[in-house]
Amino acid sequence: MLSPKRTRFRKQHRGRMKGISSRGNHISFGKYALQALEPAWITSRQIEAGRRAMTRNARRGGKIWVRIFPDKPVTLRPAETRMGSGKGSPEYWVAVVKPGRILYEMGGVTENIARRAISLAASKMPKRTQFIIS
């Protein structure tokens, strides 16, 4: 699973996802891509599940690029803990994705193989996405 090697701070505020993605919203490596249509936090597990689904479906053919990286720590408090006594400890990592962001790219395969592989990855994502061609 993806996570940063080291970070400047252990914990982060949740923040909010306003507007559309201004970066990473064009295909730059492959020919086909999966684009987010709604704002979401995508966990490192979901990113990995999507990547695995695509690689298994493509079967050695083509190349896959993962265009997002989980760099935001999400903290959780233990179950049945009273309020107070500080913020919880970091449990997992998420990538903050705004509408328009490219999640995965694929190249070196035919369109129908890419469509099938990318639709499998899309089913692993928590929000609506679309298939695009450069």
UniProtKB/Swiss-Prot annotation:
Q: Which UniProt keywords apply?
A: Chloroplast, Plastid, Ribonucleoprotein, Ribosomal protein
Q: Which PROSITE patterns match?
A: RIBOSOMAL_L16_1, RIBOSOMAL_L16_2
Subcellular location(s) of the protein: Plastid, Chloroplast
Q: Where is the composition biased (Basic residues)?
A: 1-17
In terms of Gene3D superfamilies, this protein maps to: Ribosomal protein L10e/L16
KW Transferase (keyword) present = no
Q: Where is this region: Disordered?
A: 1-22
Q: Which residues form the signal peptide?
A: none
**Sorted alphabetically, which Pfam families does this protein's record hold?**
Ribosomal_L16
- GO biological process, alphabetically ordered: mitochondrial translation
Query: How is this protein organized at the quaternary level?
Result: Part of the 50S ribosomal subunit.
* Family matches, as PANTHER family: 50S/60S RIBOSOMAL PROTEIN L16, LARGE RIBOSOMAL SUBUNIT PROTEIN UL16M
The entry's protein name is Large ribosomal subunit protein uL16c
Q: Which gene does this sequence derive from?
A: rpl16
